[in-house]
Amino acid sequence: MASSSSVVKPTPTGPQVFICFRGADVRKHFISFLVPALREANINVFIDENEFLGSEMANLLTRIEESELALVIFSVDFTRSHRCLNELAKIKERKDQGRLIVIPIFYKVKPSAVKFLEGKFGDNFRALERNNRHMLPITQKWKEALESIPGSIGMPLAEQSERTDNDFINSMVIKIQQLLENMAVRRNNEIEAQRKLVSIVPPKKPKGEANPQGGSMVPARKPEREASQEGSSVVPSMVPARDLDITHSEKPQKWTWSTINEAPNSAEIEIATLNKVYWLKIVGTITTENLTPGAKYEAVFVVKLENNASGWEQPVNLKLKVVQHDGDDDRVDRTENLNDYIGQNWVDILAGVFVVPPKTTPATIIFTMYQYEDKYKKKGLVVKGVAIRPTN
């Protein structure tokens, strides 16, 4: 047990680094030293802490999608694991899309044995392939990933190497720090160039309002209504909850679906209520084809937190991304503390503000609310949808 005088460092919040590995031996003798070293260097690293408790594969694949860099720790027993090979196939997919940088680590196994499926590494794969011959499309993806990923520039540690694991880990940390720094510089340059085509407007901080989290804070608001030319009010364009991609929303023990009527004779609105989860992820998309070019719009999650809501000690992350027709993208990230809204009525949680590009270059707007803090189970969040409305 740590002494009461020990200093607890804040959790890193930079680009996520996903680690794919296999086996208790690798975890005990390598990963258990690598991960603390990365976190000590303020690198935001994710590993499957619940490897032996049957973590859901969908959660791990989502983690890969949220990562910008992946470390694949190839060891002799790597190819004995369905889980690792499924992760590897997803890593290859993201790499091929240009969404993920991959560093293969050859831990006491030859790079050639991995790439050409030689020795025990290859024997393990062929045995797994035979046992799953009825799953040919999946095993083919495994094989393609095993051929592709080792081709990236990696770092080998031979079985009989005179180099210590500690020395090897230190060199890994330095390499990863350099990569993350280069990624940050490249991203800033890309954003500056892309703003000539699509403007993303960061949320403004109200005067006199401090943000305890250190980022830009925009207070949640009650959903607004716009006046029509006839003087009546109309509800802003809404992406309903059912059209959002809410992780685990199909599982009644985690989310409950119900309907509400906000006014007499009004249409029913379907809402999703969070029962209890560790990982929260809600994603929605729209295209700009039906929006006014050059106009500024905001995307806000319309939610409320019930009186018994809990598990919101850490803020949620909000991301708005504009993906252009040529695959380029720009984005804004911010955080919001939902604890402040427990027991209130419907509020708007700002995802971001964007300027619509010309009709000739339409874009897809992706808005995300997520929080992967696995220390607290979250409950009591009610989701109505995401409102898209013009701003002044």
From Swiss-Prot:
- Source species, domain of life: Eukaryota
Per the UniProt entry, the Enzyme Commission number(s) are: 3.2.2.6
Any single GO molecular-function term of the entry would be: NAD+ nucleosidase activity, cyclic ADP-ribose generating
Q: What reaction does this enzyme carry out catalytically? A: NAD(+) + H2O = ADP-D-ribose + nicotinamide + H(+)
The cross-references to SMART domains, in alphabetical order and at most eight, read: TIR
- InterPro entries in alphabetical order: PP2-like, PP2-like/Lectin, TIR_dom, Toll_tir_struct_dom_sf
**Full protein name:** Protein PHLOEM PROTEIN 2-LIKE A6
